[in-house]
Design a protein with these regions (language model features):
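Short, charged, surface-exposed secondary-structure boundary motifs
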Residues: 182-188
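P-loop NTPase catalytic phosphate-binding loop
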Residues: 1-109, 116-178, 195-197, 214, ...
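Conserved C-terminal "switch" segment of AAA+ ATPases
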Residues: 192-208
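Glycine-centered helix-coil hinge/cap
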Residues: 142, 188-191
């Protein structure tokens, strides 16, 4: 298991590193417009967590079937489009099993891409929409002690996406790119600071609802390694079974 914190972002003004662990930051909300670097950072974050938590299991719910995640298509724990509901129910079963057991579990890391699109699609059926929101809310509220962690990426993290105020349970909130005033209020509701203009890969992060910090995503180019690392935690290649 991981013993030291992970350097995940660069604090620009202080010239320091922003470090996290799954204990200190169990859940992550990543937001920003198209082209802001959400997907790139999401891949980077998942890979860094996998490198530090060797026993972790990863689930990817990729509702839009983003080309950046398509290379995971043959892996057991990757779900896209309407199959995301299948994956979420599988995750919920694991989560409920952990709630009634006291053993020391290895981390379960769930990445949900474009949550707003997934909920919008299932809004035609209130029962399905409510089920999604209920599962996510329960994990956000009770997942930490059972080592179940959610990373959510969405362009618009409106409170209506989350049941029972569950959005407040994200301990790591990152807004990439130039957020609208409304977008800032959604993830940094208590801050009235003036935000700097943010180019690709730059934005603001708040840990535990503290004042946002101006940050940059570390530069990296070895995408092959990132994909290889994540694949080791995705439950196996279905084509090899």
């Amino acid at each position: 298991m991981m013993k030291t914190s992970i350097n995940i972002l660069n604090a620009i003004d202080d010239n320091k590193k922003i470090s996290i662990t799954l204990t200190s930051c169990p859940h992550y909300l990543i937001t920003g417009g198209t082209g802001s670097g959400k997907t790139t950072f999401s891949l980077y974050l998942i890979a860094k967590l996998c490198l530090s938590y060797k026993e972790a299991t990863v689930y990817i719910l990729d509702f839009k079937g983003d080309e950046n995640f398509q290379r995971f298509n043959n892996y057991e724990n990757y779900f896209s489009y309407t199959d995301c509901m299948i994956g979420l129910k599988e995750i919920y079963e694991i989560f409920n099993n952990r709630l009634i057991n006291t053993e020391d579990f290895s981390p379960l890391i769930i990445f949900i891409d474009e949550l707003a699109s997934m909920i919008s699609y299932f809004s035609g059926s209130n029962s399905e929409k409510n089920k999604i929101q209920k599962i996510i809310a329960e994990i956000l509220m009770m997942g930490r002690s059972k080592k179940v962690h959610i990373i959510t990426s969405t362009q618009r993290p409106d409170s209506s996406l989350f049941a029972n105020g569950a959005r407040d349970n994200y301990t790591f909130k990152l807004g990439l790119g130039n957020l609208s005033s409304e977008g800032k209020k959604m993830i940094f509701p208590s801050s009235d600071m003036l935000f700097k203009k943010c180019n690709l890969g730059y934005g603001y992060v708040s840990l535990h609802s503290n004042e946002p910090i101006f940050v940059g995503v570390p530069a990296f180019s070895n995408y092959k390694k990132i994909y290889s690392v994540i694949k080791l935690h995705l439950g196996g290649d279905k084509n090899k079974n």
